[in-house]
Amino acid sequence: MKFTDKTTQADTQRTITKDGFLVVPATISKVGVFDYLATELGLKEDGIKKVARTEKSLFSDETIKSFENATLTVGHLKDGVNAKNWKQLSVGVVRNVKRVGDELTAEAWIYDEQAIKTVQEHGVEQLSCGYDCDIKPSTVQDADFEMSPMIGNHVAIVAKGRCGGSVKLADEDKTIMGKTAKILDAFLGAFGIKLSDEQKKQIEDEEKSGSEEGKEPKGEQPTKPKEKKSEPENKKEDDVEKEELEKSLKAKDEEIQQLKDAQAKRDAEVKQAAVLADAKTAFKEVNFADNATVREIQESAVVAQGIFTKDEAAKLSDEEISGAYQTAKVVVAKLADERKSLGNILLGDAEPKAAPKIDFNKTYNS
């Protein structure tokens, strides 16, 4: 079963290497009991289940080795990282994975320029582990299930993680949040952002201060108009604040999407240039347009070799065209070898064979 869990990167001790890579000490996972939707666990029911991540789940040699040199990505893919999508998704690597107390720590080496900018300038600084494990009935108190040893696949940079920041679940249970803080926490949670403890406290203090300022001195009775006036005003202020937060979050989402689109465009350009150079080398007799797409390049090569007609090629998927292109390359290479061998024979380049020797004296004197 595939899982993704998240923690916060360290905001100190970050270093930039001489090559411009960002190295960030980070906690990638920790021991504890965490909330999962029942559907995430493959259960045919609704609600939330408590799942224990034990020392055996997190600190086995197999688990630590699986996260060493794991691919670092921006966001998750449903099927994880594999040989087909690694080049497109990778922005770095995870190194020096080890146990420190109840936490699994590592160094996140971020190589990609846009990913570094996202972390440094836009505050997207939580890590999310992508891994496989099984769940079984728990022997841990207050947990419904517990995990088998985790097998790491990748570590992603994300906006919000299941493990939150540095706050443990037990601490969160003891915190009594004010009404406004609860509303904002739930609202921001829908966008993948979590209020920090300092932000919650500030909101609660402001809420408390506002309620005390609205009280009348002893001996005076508040009039009904004043009571009716204060409620809409407070509500209006909350609405304005929510609108501003919503606009800010929308702008940040758009900015992150622009970064992803720019990265995808660069990857496509690099792939197109590589395929074009490969095609011009393998198929010298075919003219390829410099601005042709990867599919157009491969399709032209396949049609030129007579593997498919133009109409037949147009009906194939990108994967089928790519496979046919590789076949065409093999055919061209084989034909080139055969032409070379034939040329050697026709031009007499082949090594001459010695004529048989006959001893006439021995033949006729016997």
From Swiss-Prot:
InterPro entries assigned: UCP029215
Protein name: Uncharacterized protein HI_1405
Domain of life: Bacteria
UniProt cross-references to Pfam families, sorted A to Z: DUF2213 (PF09979)
Stretches for region Disordered: 199-267
